[in-house]
UniProtKB/Swiss-Prot annotation:
Species: Chlorobaculum tepidum (strain ATCC 49652 / DSM 12025 / NBRC 103806 / TLS)
Taxonomic lineage of the native organism: Bacteria, Pseudomonadati, Chlorobiota, Chlorobiia, Chlorobiales
Protein name: Protein-L-isoaspartate O-methyltransferase
EC number: 2.1.1.77
Matches recorded under Pfam families: PCMT
Gene Ontology process terms (BP): methylation; protein modification process; protein repair
One GO MF term: protein-L-isoaspartate (D-aspartate) O-methyltransferase activity
């Protein structure tokens, strides 16, 4: 599916993604391995797709947009992803050379993503647990990416940023969120607000309640 990946990257460029490192990672990582057989023929379309358990793999543009926000501010280092999901975002981050830690709260997704990441030989450290609490034993992180909608600023995650570290997180209600970049400056935090997106909710002790639990 190399041709389909190339077409996806052309489309990402058309949508305004311009970072060469990010585009190269999207050319390399095989998205079709992170979706089920039924979705595989459409893996390189710019669409979110269900991955089970009420969760989705984000559309390529969204993943590229968030990744670009991180790469342009923190080009290397140790990164925490909240919400492993399919494992695709973690694979992109690993391809970019980050030391990747990722947390997933749903056991079925954690297991499935782990199998794919292991098969690809990617240096990703997965954990099953409540992502809203971060990974204090491995903190601080140079970057944190949250792949679900937070209802408010995630203060625990912010506290796990290294000096100068960056948190990329969609914040808002369940219908629409603003992509937000938060950078740590000592005990202060600088904020940048970007476009609106729609993500599945970030569930956990410091996120939304999970009505299925």
């Amino acid at each position: 599916m190399a041709r389909e990946r190339q077409e996806m990257v052309v489309e990402l460029k058309r949508y305004g993604i311009s970072n060469a490192r990010v585009l190269d990672a999207f050319l390399t990582v095989r998205r079709h391995l992170f979706v089920d057989a039924q979705s595989r023929p459409y893996a390189y379309s710019d669409n979110a797709m269900p991955i089970g358990f009420g969760q989705t793999i984000s559309q390529p543009y969204t993943v590229a947009y968030m990744t670009s926000l991180l790469v342009e501010r923190v080009p290397s280092g140790k990164v925490l992803e909240i919400g492993t999901g399919s494992g695709y975002q973690a694979a992109i981050l690993a391809e970019l050379g980050y030391r990747v830690y990722t947390i997933e709260r749903i056991a079925g997704l954690y297991a499935a993503a782990g199998r794919v990441l292991d098969a690809l030989g990617l240096p990703v450290h997965p954990r099953l647990g409540d992502g809203t609490l971060g990974w204090p034993e491995e903190a601080p992180f140079d970057g944190i990416i949250v792949t679900a909608a937070a209802p408010r600023e995630p203060h625990t995650l912010m506290s796990q940023l290294a000096e100068g570290g960056v948190l990329v997180v969609p914040i808002g209600d369940l219908g629409s969120q603003q992509m937000t970049v938060i950078r740590r400056r000592g005990e202060r935090f600088e904020h940048e607000i970007f476009h609106n997106f729609a993500f599945v909710p970030l569930c956990g002790r410091e996120g939304w309640a999970d009505n299925n639990e």
